[in-house]
Amino acid sequence: MRLSKTLYLFLLIALAVNNAFSADIKVRVLSSYNVKTVDVKIISGNYMMLCNNLKVFVNDLIPDEAITLTFHNNQIRVEKGIEFIGTYNQIEFIGKKYNNVFSLSSTQIDRKRYYEEDLMITARHEMLFINHVDLEKYIAGVVQSEVFGSSEDVEFFKIQATVSRTYCLANLNRHLKEGYNLCDDVHCQSYKGRCTNGDILRGTFESFSDVIVDSTNKLISTAYHSNSGGMTEDAHKIWQVKVPYLLSKVDTFSIGAKNYQWEKAIPRQQWINFFVIRYGDAYKSPEKQEQIFNFQQKERIAKWVIDDDTISTKDIRDYFKLRSSYFSVEMKKDTVYLHGKGYGHGVGLSQEGAIKMVQLGYSYIDIIRFYYNNVSVIKYTDIIEF
C-alpha cells in the first residue's frame, strides 16, 4: 500500500514523538570507504558546527549551506566555499531544530547519502564518520537498506524492524572500544541513511520498541536469510553452537518464491579437483567419483559422509559461491549440475517465507514465533535501561 504525503508526514511526526522515549546510538557511517574529501550539506533544520569543541561560526548552518572536509596530514581541513576555516582533529554538526537532515557526498563513495540528526568526524588514520541518531530512526534506515523492494506489506516491515532492533540492542557494545556502537556495513547491519519510505516508517512506528526474547527474557540472535528452500537449518549444524530457538523445521511458506530454487553447472574436472585437493587422491578413483556425482539432499545435511571422510556442505557452498548448502548433484556428460534450494544459511527467519505468511494473513508476532522457537515479543524498556 502506498501512503499519501499527509500520512507520510504524520508518521514522521509520530515517530518523532515516540523518539522522545527512545534511545540514541552512535553508528559509524561510510565505514567501508576510505574518504579523503567529503561535502557535508545541510538539507533541513539548523546545525551548530563545532571544531575541536569550539563554535567557529556565529550563526548556525542552514539548508543549502555546505562544508568541505579534507583529510590531510592526519588532520581535517575545513573549508566553506572558497574560505579556509582551519585544520582540526574533530568536527561536529549538531542539529538544533526538528527534522535535522544532512547529506554526505564524495567522489569516493557510491552515491550521496542522507542522514538524520548529528554527525561527528574524527581524525585518526582516516576520517571516522559517526552518525549520532535516534534508535528508531536508525532501525527504519536499516530496514530500508536491507529489504526495500522485497515487499510492500507493513506487517513484513514490522517483522524486519523488530528483528533489526533486537540485533542492534543485542550487539550494542560491538564497537564500543572504537568510540561507537555499530557500523553501517553488513558486519553489523546495512545502514545507508535515513528512511524515506512511508510503509517502512509505519512498520517501524507500529512495532515501536518491540524486541524478541527467549524463554529466559534474553535478547535472541535474530538470524535470517532470503529463502529456506522449504526447510530451515539448525544453528548448531552451521555455527557449532546449540541455540534452542534456532532449530530446523519444515517451512512450506518459502516454497515457490523467487529464491526457492537455483541451479549451477560446474565442469566435471573442477568438481573432482575440489575433493582431491581437500580430501586426497582417493577421489581420483571411479568408486569415490561415483559417490560425489550422485548426492541427494531430501532434507538439509550439514555433513556429507563419504566412507571415512566428513565433508561440510557449507565448505562446498563457500568454495563454489553457491546460493545455499542445500543442493543435490547430477552428472551429465562432462558437467556436474547442482540443483539447489533456498538462498542463504537457512538459519532463523526466511524473508520470503515471512512475506508469504503475511499475504496469508498471519500476524507479525505469529510469524516471528514460527521461525524462532519458544520466543516472546516484548518492549525493550522492560529489560534494558539507557
Region annotations inferred by a language model:
Residues 3-16:
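Sec-dependent N-terminal signal peptides
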